[in-house]
Amino acid sequence: MPFVNVKLIEGVFTPDQKQQIIRDLTEAMVAIEGENLRPVTWVVVEEVHSGHWGVAGNPLSTADVKALAAGAPVG
């Protein structure tokens, strides 16, 4: 029974985007393990509070991730 746990910084993805993540990861697992495992393929999306995620020794905020996605340097 596949269990996929995705951690994201809160406020970066919309509810629709999170649903798409769940659908796409389920499809990826089914493609690998077979259709019979679809009913028992679990995908959990956990959101981590802004600033509670560290990269290179520094906290990363929702604003930082959105800036990165827009192509701006963070630092």
Regions found by a protein language model. Name each.
Residues 2-75:
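A domain-level signal for the structural core that forms small-molecule/cofactor-binding pockets
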